[in-house]
A protein has these predicted regions:
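Metal-dependent phosphoester/phosphodiester hydrolase catalytic core
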Residues: 1-469
């Protein structure tokens, strides 16, 4: 996929959350400039300064700069003279958005822009009415499935592998895939509905499979370990770091999990993809990071981003049926992607136990998830009361048929209790009857006077009643 000539010569700024306290919010801004253009000038209150070069790829130069803004209801920065207000106040009342699944597997960039990005526009209107301080993006920020096949040697991925690649072939494939990934990100970042939010609300993002390719980590080991597979992963990882973290350099290999401690709040984002294999969800580094971010002492509230739902129906029943009968074999990778897979049950219990222990220790813990293109909520009983999971998916992905949502709802009625004496239950959204709501959606988390609540915004039905969490 070539870089479209119709793209503007400058795209951005995009804001990334780097930290904050009672006095300031720490940020990073990213601006893409077509090669040959002047460096963008950033003014964060101390006069304009040229933004340093972070990366160059596919005909664009990417400029990134770290800066801080004082805590305020409407702090301001400017890029090339265009000013943007940011709500940097992190103490007291707080509004946080959560989105996931920003695209579709096939033909996503061919969709009508206004239709595709209708919920981004709705999120922008919600922000304009009552500003957000943070936007969390929980996975599948792009659907790069087509980009992984952007070179003839990759056209059959993942079923038809080309065999070992020479150094020249690897370089050629890398360049083709890098160009395709870059074109997709730039096209999406240039969309006005996304750009409005991205310049005004700093984001913290964690990837999932479609940011690489459908089912990454749950595919056959020979595909994951092939020269083509490792090249695809390297391209996707570099693209994630640049576009979703604003980092142009390379980082040490391993998991990309991260957490931020803010006033009264920790945001924890485990990486469930970098070390994933058919037989595991996380490797040693991922578990080291996750154990640390879920350990006490912690602020009074922890939001845990699990790109794949941690509390869900008994999908292992469906997985058993597929494995025994061979029916619906094409869904085996999707089923193995789930925490509930037979292959991951021990890890799932370990993850749930860490969540439960943190919650029971006095830190109110809430799981945020996406991935399923539906909205729902769930609870797991703990000694300190119910631990909530809130699922919002997707902001751009077309919802599945109602029959699929009903089937999942029937499966959810079986219940599940991977931890003895701590049953998991799935629930309808406030004011709704079905367990799963099949409308495009995003989630708003609000802290008011120290109390937290969640509100889903649904494309057709509007905002739900608040759910106290």
């Amino acid at each position: 996929m070539a870089i479209p000539d119709t793209l503007p010569d400058r795209i951005g700024p995009v804001l990334y959350l780097r930290g904050g306290d009672a006095d300031e919010m720490r940020l990073r801004a990213l601006v893409a400039v077509r090669d040959g253009g002047a460096a963008p000038m950033l003014d964060a209150g101390h006069g304009p300064a040229a933004m340093p070069v972070a990366a160059r790829r596919a005909g664009f130069t990417f400029h990134a700069a770290d800066f801080a803004l004082p805590a305020a209801a409407a702090a301001q920065y400017a890029v090339d003279g265009a000013a943007f207000d940011v709500r940097t106040e992190l103490t007291g009342n707080l509004r946080i958005g959560y989105v996931s699944c920003n695209g579709e597997e096939h033909g996503d960039l061919d969709r009508d822009g206004a239709e595709r990005d209708a919920m981004w526009a709705a999120l922008g209107r919600a922000h304009d009415a009552a500003p957000l301080s943070i936007l969390l993006q929980g996975g599948d920020q792009v659907y790069a499935d087509e980009d992984g096949r952007a070179h003839p040697l990759a056209a059959g991925w993942p079923d038809a592998l080309p065999g070992p690649l020479s150094a020249a072939q690897r370089a050629e494939v890398y360049a083709a895939l890098e160009s395709a990934f870059t074109a997709r990100y730039l096209t999406l970042y240039a969309r006005p509905e996304f750009a409005h939010i991205a310049a005004r609300v700093p984001t913290l993002a964690m990837w999932d499979d479609h940011d690489i390719c459908d089912g990454w980590g749950s595919l056959r080991a020979d595909a994951l370990d092939s020269d083509l597979g490792r090249t695809l992963f390297a391209v996707a990882r570099a693209a994630f770091l640049l576009f979703q973290r604003g980092e142009g350099g390379t980082t040490a290999p391993g998991a990309l999990g991260m957490h931020l401690d803010l006033p009264g709040l920790r945001i924890a984002a485990p990486d469930l993809r970098s070390e994933r294999r058919p037989e595991r969800v996380m490797g040693p580094e991922g578990w080291r990071q996750t154990t640390a971010m879920l350990a006490a002492p912690a602020p009074e509230r922890v939001l845990v981003m699990s790109s794949v739902p941690a509390l869900g129906p008994r999908l292992s029943v469906v997985e058993t049926l597929v494995n025994r009968t061979g029916l619906m074999r094409k869904y085996s990778d999707d089923l193995r992607d789930q925490w509930q897979s037979h292959a991951h049950r021990t890890e799932w219990q370990r993850f749930l136990r860490a969540l439960s222990d943190l919650h029971a220790g006095g830190t109110r813990t809430t799981v945020l998830s996406g991935e399923i293109h539906l909205a729902t909520c769930a609870t797991m009983q703990t000694p300190a009361g119910p631990l909530h999971q809130l699922v919002a998916s997707g902001i751009a992905h077309t919802p599945p048929p109602r029959g699929f949502a009903r089937a999942l709802g029937l499966l959810a009625r079986f219940g599940e209790a991977p931890l003895r004496g701590q049953p998991i239950r799935l629930h309808p959204l406030p004011g709704r009857r079905p367990i799963y709501t099949n409308e495009r959606n995003f989630l708003m988390l609000e802290r008011t006077g120290g109390a937290w609540q969640a509100v889903w915004h649904l494309e057709e039905s509007g905002a739900t009643d608040p759910l106290p969490i």
